[in-house]
Amino acid sequence: MYEAQYLWLFGLVLISGSVTERTTPKINFTTVVGLKTTPAMRSSSASSLGGSLPMVINTWNFTDANFLAWRILNVTQGGLRQTRNAVVEGCTRCEQQQCDRTVGYGGSPDELGETTLDAMIMDGSSMDVGAVAGLRGIKDAIRVARHVLEHTKHSMLVGDLASQFAQAMGFRSESLATPESKAMWMEWTAANCQPNFWRNVHPDPSISCGPYKPKATPLTRWKEDRARTEYSIGHLNHDTIGMIAIDAENNIHAGTSSNGARHKIPGRVGDSPIPGAGAYADNEVGAAVATGDGDIMMRFLPTLLAVEAMRAGKKPAEAAEVGIRRISKHYKDFSGAVIAVDRLGQYGAACYGMTEFPFVVSNPSKTDIPSRQESVKCITGKEAVNVV
């Protein structure tokens, strides 16, 4: 009798569609659909058709960082509670390897020849953030950001005082300069400091070094040159590793690390350590990371836009396009990319100002190919007219 009642009740649950996510078998399958395999898909984005957890995904072709994060994520069965370790140590690997000289020490010297670091880690369960910006003399930027998250009630520390905090937490102070970064700076100064980030100053920043002073022209008569083609973003000039890790229980962390824009004005901070700009995570929805022209991208909070677009029902690939299209409406010459992932492990990417954008993914769908490289072709100027 009781057995018949249980069978009847189970059948009713199935018919009503109220079976919980935990009782639904997970589909171990992820295909980044290339632009050539699905005609209906725009050439601006790529997306998985099914979720697959746990997973790690990061910007650019930084496979070693992804592989380490993937190993850490699977230290315990299902990667449970390992997402923070995975993201922090994955990005740390890139800092140590000086990935393309755009992450970590010894790259992207500012106008004075100094390398400074920006990094962030965000917890999608608590919405807590730890970040550092303009970090001087400390190599472990994202580990310091983790200490901000775990040992303070703040969200961000900056500059020399961030470095003092790091030393108090046990981090070693050392020079971030290398022979390569010094040579990079010397070549730049020998070329009359070209290109640079100055405008509306004298002497003319397009042909000479500073020091500069503001023009006396009234503000209403200033002509702003918004073109940034001198700083086209791509291989060897893309600034940031952004990484997302999700475990089998849908716990999410997202993080970034960068040494910023090459030859930046000292004191400049880009999008990488800014929540909603460089990265954003919310366990209820998913996460997103961004890379590219940070000075422009941070004005639009593209990773927050992507997560909120997924909350509103858009698929990850569509959500990644939201911020990209919003930015390209105002800045035709910007270059950048966004990766979006929902809480089930479905992912997508969109980019602009480049031919294509590579990224790296690890998940259970292809255990024989961990840290596999995938790419997406970018939105063109004509496609970007259709702003979301």
UniProtKB/Swiss-Prot annotation:
UniProt enzyme class: hydrolase
Listed InterPro entries: Ntn_hydrolases_N, Peptidase_T2
EC number: 3.5.1.26
Source taxon at top rank: Eukaryota
Residues where substrate binds: 268-271, 291-294
MF annotations from Gene Ontology: N4-(beta-N-acetylglucosaminyl)-L-asparaginase activity; peptidase activity
Active site: 240 (nucleophile)
Keyword Transferase on entry: no
UniProt signal peptide: 1-20
Reaction equations catalysed: N(4)-(beta-N-acetyl-D-glucosaminyl)-L-asparagine + H2O = N-acetyl-beta-D-glucosaminylamine + L-aspartate + H(+)
Single biological process term from Gene Ontology: proteolysis
UniProt entry keywords in alphabetical sequence: Autocatalytic cleavage, Disulfide bond, Hydrolase, Protease, Signal
Post-translational events: Cleaved into an alpha and beta chain by autocatalysis; this activates the enzyme. The N-terminal residue of the beta subunit is responsible for the nucleophile hydrolase activity.
Disulfide-bonded cysteines: 94-99, 193-209, 351-378
A cellular component term, taken from the record's GO annotations: lysosome
CDD domains for this protein: Glycosylasparaginase
Presence of the UniProt keyword Hydrolase in the record: yes
Family: Belongs to the Ntn-hydrolase family.
Cited function: Cleaves the GlcNAc-Asn bond which joins oligosaccharides to the peptide of asparagine-linked glycoproteins.
Subunit structure: Heterotetramer of two alpha and two beta chains arranged as a dimer of alpha/beta heterodimers.
Name this protein carries in UniProt: Putative N(4)-(beta-N-acetylglucosaminyl)-L-asparaginase GA14866
